[in-house]
């Protein structure tokens, strides 16, 4: 008999409530409810509409409970963003969006207090202005911060509203850059030196922790009272759990708005070389470390689509991939991680401005711009995997691409060509699968991440891509891309048109 679990998977563009059925050998997924997840710009900055997110989640849970006996609920989302609660447990304000510009200059401010090397040695986390650490530094002295008693990351905030429990799940907590990687607890020393109160942070719990049943009033509202689990609540952590790899020598790309590119490690790697390469050591399932690099991902193309739609031209991702496939190859390139591409805006114009500023002929039209973005992403992936191999001393035998980007056959093929490694694409729904299977693990239905990966591999089809194309051309393109990244590092790119 199949057990049913609900995975709530929150992404930067949309959220979903997914019903997972697991019979002990195979699993299946059914999307119960989907809703847009849009940021809201207020006078004080860019925010998430977290109350609407909660209401949409409740609607999805109620729908599922009418159809099935649900044995568990788990929440996953992106990292770093958080809500603040006052002493009565009330939300102080809608959470800020990590793309809000208030963190500009906060890295330098932090390094003026605690040297960069010490922060990395303590936390092992990549330096990004979006990290919770820098968001908190930017909030010091604000009325919101002054009345805050508890900080909860987005999945933990939802869990609190469902169960009343205030905890921070470990895989997501590590993204804050405030966790001591040796003790797996909040670094009280780092917090004290930065002038941030350790009392703000809730206790850390490992994935597969049962938080308890729904609050009585929530259970009455939804017509069910399933237990809630702290799963691997960082969406990439859930996705990596569900990578259907049969051997340990795989690299992964969790491909969506962000692309997270890396390997699974038993120990964190905090060498100077890892810090200078801006690799991160995020928490994984069963005590593993996700040694990876954050790459801007499909965000650039998402923003291009929004701009083109505003201009009256609607393109699906599938249409853009078809157009890009027929566009000339080995053309202009961009560094997807350049600061010019972080904030929302006219991204097509920024791509053109970047190319022009770097002495390249700017791409004209959606086909050429999409080709530029796809080739640049593939080269960035190849670069990150080459770095991961060098930093870990391990050889990678294949690349597993999971998430929405695994549907993009062109990007997968370009990744195989650029890296010279075979690519296995899928499953698309790896995050929801990992969420469901960690709940099954908590219930004792599976015993390890290896068993979970075998279940996923037996339950869902994947696609294979072998390296092809002109190897010499790709080698030259890789060298040109590497030079471009080095030269663009200190270059300011104007917004353009």
Set out the residue ranges of the language-model regions.
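N-terminal glycine/serine-rich phosphate-binding loop of ATP-dependent small-molecule kinases
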Residues: 1-93, 121, 203, 219-228, ...
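Active-site core segments that coordinate phosphate-bearing ligands/cofactors
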Residues: 6-7, 19, 111-123, 129, ...
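Short, basic and Ser/Thr-rich N-terminal targeting/leader segments
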Residues: 11-13, 69-71, 76-78, 132, ...
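A glycine-/small-polar-enriched, mobile loop at the entrance of the PLP active site in fold-type I
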Residues: 38-41, 123-132, 174-178, 199-207, ...
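Short glycine-rich phosphate-binding loop at a beta-alpha junction
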Residues: 69-77, 150, 203, 391-403
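Glycine-rich beta-strand-to-loop/alpha-helix junction loops that act as flexible
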Residues: 76-80, 207-208, 255-258, 398-406
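Carbohydrate-associated surface elements
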Residues: 100
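Enzymes and membrane/adaptor proteins characterized by extended Gly/Ser/Thr/Asp/Glu-rich
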Residues: 164-173
């Amino acid at each position: 008999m199949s057990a049913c679990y609900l995975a709530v998977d929150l992404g930067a563009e949309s959220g979903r409530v997914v019903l997972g059925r697991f019979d002990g050998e195979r699993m299946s997924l059914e999307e119960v409810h989907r809703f847009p997840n849009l940021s809201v710009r207020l006078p004080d900055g860019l925010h998430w509409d977290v109350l609407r997110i909660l209401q949409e989640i409740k609607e999805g849970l109620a729908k599922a409970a009418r159809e099935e006996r649900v044995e568990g609920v788990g929440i996953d989302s992106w990292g770093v963003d958080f809500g603040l609660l006052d002493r009565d447990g009330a939300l102080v304000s809608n959470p800020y969006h990590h793309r809000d510009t208030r963190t500009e200059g906060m890295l330098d401010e932090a390094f003026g207090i605690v040297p960069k090397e010490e922060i990395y040695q303590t936390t092992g986390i990549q330096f990004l202005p979006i990290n919770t650490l820098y968001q908190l530094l930017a909030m010091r002295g604000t009325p919101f911060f002054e009345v805050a008693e508890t900080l909860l990351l987005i999945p933990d905030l939802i869990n609190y509203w469902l169960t009343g429990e205030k905890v921070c799940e470990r895989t997501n907590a590590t993204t804050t850059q405030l966790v001591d990687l040796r003790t797996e607890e909040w670094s009280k020393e780092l917090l004290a030196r930065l002038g941030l109160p350790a009392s703000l942070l809730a206790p850390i719990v490992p994935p597969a922790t049962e938080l308890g049943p729904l609050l009585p009033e929530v259970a009455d509202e939804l017509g069910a009272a399933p237990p809630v689990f702290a799963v691997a609540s960082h969406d990439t952590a859930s996705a990596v759990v569900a990578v259907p790899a049969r051997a340990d020598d795989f690299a992964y790309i969790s491909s969506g708005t962000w692309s997270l590119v890396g390997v699974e490690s038993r120990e964190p790697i905090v060498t100077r070389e890892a810090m200078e390469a801006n690799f991160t050591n995020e928490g994984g399932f069963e005590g593993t470390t996700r040694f990876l690099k954050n790459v801007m991902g499909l965000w650039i193309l998402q923003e291009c689509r929004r701009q083109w739609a505003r201009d009256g031209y609607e393109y699906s991702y599938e249409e853009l991939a078809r157009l890009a496939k027929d566009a000339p190859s080995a053309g202009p390139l961009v560094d997807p991680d350049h600061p010019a591409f972080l904030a929302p805006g006219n991204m097509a114009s920024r791509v053109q401005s970047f190319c022009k500023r770097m002495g390249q002929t700017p791409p004209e039209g959606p086909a050429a711009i999409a080709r530029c973005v796809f080739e640049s992403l593939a080269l960035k992936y190849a670069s990150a995997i080459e770095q991961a191999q060098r930093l870990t001393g391990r050889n990678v035998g294949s690349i597993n691409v999971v998430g929405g980007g695994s549907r993009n056959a062109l990007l997968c093929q370009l990744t195989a060509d650029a890296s010279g490694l075979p690519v296995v694409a899928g499953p698309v729904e790896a995050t929801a699968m990992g969420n469901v299977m960690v709940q099954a693990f908590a219930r004792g239905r599976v015993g390890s991440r290896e068993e979970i990966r075998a279940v996923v591999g037996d339950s869902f089809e994947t696609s294979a891509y072998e390296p092809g194309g002109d190897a010499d051309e790709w080698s030259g393109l890789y060298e040109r891309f590497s030079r471009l990244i080095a030269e663009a590092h200190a270059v300011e790119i104007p917004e353009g048109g």
